[in-house]
Curated annotation (Swiss-Prot):
Its EC number is 4.1.2.40. It comes from the Bacteria. GO terms for biological process: 6-sulfoquinovose(1-) catabolic process; D-tagatose 6-phosphate catabolic process; lactose catabolic process via tagatose-6-phosphate. This is Tagatose 1,6-diphosphate aldolase. PANTHER family: SULFOFRUCTOSEPHOSPHATE ALDOLASE. It comes from Staphylococcus haemolyticus (strain JCSC1435). It catalyses: D-tagatofuranose 1,6-bisphosphate = D-glyceraldehyde 3-phosphate + dihydroxyacetone phosphate. Keywords: Lactose metabolism, Lyase. InterPro entries: Aldolase_TIM, DeoC/FbaB/LacD_aldolase, LacD_aldolase, Tag_1.6-dipho_adolase. HAMAP family: LacD. The gene is lacD. Belongs to the aldolase LacD family. One of its GO terms (molecular function) is tagatose-bisphosphate aldolase activity. Pathway: Carbohydrate metabolism; D-tagatose 6-phosphate degradation; D-glyceraldehyde 3-phosphate and glycerone phosphate from D-tagatose 6-phosphate: step 2/2.
Amino acid sequence: MTKSQQKLASIEQLSNQDGIISALAFDQRGALKRMMAEHQTEPPTVEQIEQLKVLVSEELTQYASSILLDPEYGLPASDARNKECGLLLAYEKTGYDVNAKGRLPDCLVEWSAKRLKEQGANAVKFLLYYDVDDSEEINIQKKAYIERIGSECVAEDIPFFLEVLTYDDNIPDNKSAEFAKVKPRKVNEAMKLFSEDRFNVDVLKVEVPVNMNFVEGFTEGEVVYTKEEAAQHFRDQEAATHLPYIYLSAGVSAELFQETLTFAHDAGAHFNGVLCGRATWSGAVKVYIEQGEQAAREWLRTTGYKNIDDLNKVLKTTATSWKAK
């Protein structure tokens, strides 16, 4: 699929000078509220959530090629970002209906690709929960939904970043060894599917195809994959798509995420950057609530900066320019 000049220019605005997308993810809403609630008795206020996003944006966007925010709580943070930093805006409602089967997707009802673009977004990002082994009755709805968003983004000439999170309703714990065994196929088959031209996806935001906590040499406990098996899953991921793809950090520690990127590169994965969220900023949440804004700023300027700087150094030696795709 050939991209328009406008889409290419927009992806340029989200990348660094090497054609790598080193993006900061802070579109968390439900997950962020839960993190904040661990450190205070009353529910987090809108003002608290917005201010924390502003702090992270003010302190860290000078080190990121772009930032992913949500239009519900993230617009003040968008205004506060470094002027060289590109903007992705999330289009999906946070979370999913736990009482309904299928984790069906849902857009923010007050927003459209046109409105996100008018808000200054260089790209639209949408998160989809997808299980290639789910019933076709469920999956056909998801495919049609993504086709709609893809067509909307073509109409507005704005890049479409699709984030795919895999799951299995029969394995409730996606951090378990049981899920680790099925994860590679689920991740790579979903990537292959949504790389089809009919979806008009420009960049895939994906999980790494293995749970690194079960890779030989990365764990003291149970081993699900040898190093060579894990490396093969990364090679299969590379073969699954012709599109640029970037990795999400999935809430793992900064250190493990950086080690994972090195492993992916050494295995032969030509990934094109990251959208890294909690691995960079999560430690600021507790500090912000317990010690206030100034202490949180100090954390972001020291530990937060170190996390993002270390990540950028790793990306320089591991990621590949999306322009090579």
